[in-house]
Structures are given as C-alpha cells and as structure tokens.
Amino acid sequence: MSPDAGIIRNYIEYLLNVPWYTETRDERDLIKIEKKLNDTHYGMKKAKERVIEYIAVKSITDEVSSPIICLVGPPGVGKTTFAESISKALDRNFVKISLGGMSDSAELVGQAYIGSNPGKIVTSLIKCGSNNPVFLLDEVDKLKKDYKGDPASTLLDILDVSQNKRFVDNYIDEEIDLSKILFILT
C-alpha cells in the first residue's frame, strides 16, 4: 500500500461527504414560523419581522439569495438561542462557528498542504448534512488579524452573495455553493 493511501482516502471521504445537493425543505407557513419564534423568545420584534419578511419573499420566488442577519446586543440577551430558534422555525439544520480569537483564515477555508484538512465552513457543512443550514458565525467582532492572515477578509468572501456561489475551500479545491446558507452573525 502506498504511503499516500491514507491521505488520498481522507481527501476522497471529505469530497464524497460534502452535501452537494442535499437540502432540507424550508417551512414556509408564516404563521407557524412566527409562532415558533414567539414561543421561544419574547421581544426581538424587528429581528422576527426581518426573518418573516425573508420567508415571505422566498416563498414567492426561489431566486432570492439568503440574507445575512446580524444580531447585536450585550452578552446574555439571547442572540445565539434566537439563531437556533430561527433554524428550528425554518426546519433547517443549525451550525455554530465561534470566531472569537480566530486569527488564521485557514481555519475557515482549509489548507492545501499534505496532511491538512478542510476549513470550518466545509467541515460544518459535512457535519450538518445539508447545503442550506442556518450558520451562526458567533463573535464576529472578536476576529484578529496577524501574520497568518486576515480572517475578516476571508469571511467577506464567504458572505458576499456575488462570490459565495463559487466558494473554494483550499483543501477540497472544488467550487461549493454557499448561497443557500442563511448566515447569522453576532
């Protein structure tokens, strides 16, 4: 057996496990969605209205790209649990990626050298098993820039609707469509 066999097998397993065409079906009943959000969170009226507005437009046309929602507030007000409630209300899988203290962009987009792995975006997609989850990118304000790169610039590429249909993880080295993901930032 070749010494590279394990590396090749690992790459193929990652490639085969990316949920290229597997997606969950969104709940589109606005009354049910609103009830689920109200049952789990008191207040947050504007945030709930924005989610309902997105679902209403999405139910008319599937051409609408997923919005990027930014939840702002002091610690402990329920931003993370509200993001989880959105995913449950929409019947989508939920992924949380903590960005606090991240200083290496390769953590998000993987690395290409031998023995490396995909970044958190791809591994999270594989873990959740669908191509349209709700992604919570937590503590975006705590990203750090250093000699390893600027994860904020990488994050901009991931979130930009004109680019995220053709996202390329450095390890996978194939285009992955992230446009169906509902990104929520805190």
Give each language-model segment a name.
Residues 1-61:
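Extended, charged alpha-helical coiled-coil/arm scaffolds that mediate oligomerization and mechanical coupling
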Residues 20-24, 58-65, 93, 119-121, ...:
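Active-site phosphate-binding and catalytic loops of NTP-dependent enzymes
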Residues 62-99, 126-127, 156:
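Walker A/P-loop
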Residues 64-67, 90, 115, 128-133, ...:
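Short loop/turn elements that form and flank the Walker-type P-loop nucleotide-binding site
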Residues 73, 110, 139:
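The Walker A (P-loop) glycine that initiates the GxxxxGKT/S ATP-binding motif of P-loop NTPases
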Residues 89-118, 124, 144:
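AAA+/P-loop NTPase substrate/partner-engagement loops
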Residues 113-137, 168-175:
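Conserved alpha-helical scaffold flanking the Walker A/P-loop in AAA+ ATPase domains
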Residues 137-182:
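Conserved catalytic/switch belt of AAA+ P-loop NTPases
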